[in-house]
Amino acid sequence: MSDDETNDGQRFDRLPATDAERTVEGRATRAEVVDYFTDRFGIPPETFDDYTFWEKGAGKIWIYSGDAPTPIEIEAIGMTCLRTRQEHWKPTTDFVQRVGREASDCVIKLDREQAQRFATGEDQDLEWDGDWGYLIAAHEVAGELEPIGIGLYVHGELRSMVPKGRQRDLES
């Protein structure tokens, strides 16, 4: 196996289009990433037509609007969108806030008080009749449903996954 066929935490590698093109064991494919967002959140696959997906290290997936040579040794390209090398894939807050408006599934609508609590990082007991797992938490603003971030719903509890540095007190 050459250096190009291993994970390198200092280098971005474009995701292979399909499983047949995979050269690094465990690396997600573009098709798997798009299918995940489509199957889990109902985001139309064409949403990703103008984007490329990249992995840096093990399972940190980045989305980039454009093209670049692969592999590429830079600090960042686009934004992180997904963590894949764990039992359950986890979308990032940045991704959800930018692309989450396209989602039709696994979106939990929060009222004002629930949204404020979610933004501060507070976990809360909520009823949800959909799938357990990662959900897009959203709140209506000016007549439009706006994604706040990603939450983990298990056993009747919505756990805020808003990173500590991004948590805000919105009560004032």
Residue spans for each PLM region:
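Polybasic, low-complexity RNA-engagement segments
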Residues: S2-S172
